[in-house]
Amino acid sequence: MTLFASISLISNPLKGSNSRISSSNGSGILMGSNSITCGGCGGTTTTIKSSGSFTIDSSINVYVDSKNVYSRTYHDSFNGCSS
């Protein structure tokens, strides 16, 4: 089963930013920064589909003149849609 059907990306990503989405069955994808994923259970614009739970880990690093001026890491877990 595919983790999700499509991904929408915003152009001009920040340097050093990335997101990882993985499901409980081990499938996943590494995306560029400023990525947007939208999904739901049975919606018309479902992007993320999972038979179990999934997690989203994001790290954001902002560089100004080669100096890291901002770093932030996020971790979220969700219950996926039953199939």
Swiss-Prot record:
GO terms for biological process: sorocarp development. InterPro entries: HssA/B-like_chaperone, HssA/B-related. It holds the Pfam family Coiled. Belongs to the hssA/B family. This is HssA/B-like protein 43. It comes from Dictyostelium discoideum (Social amoeba).
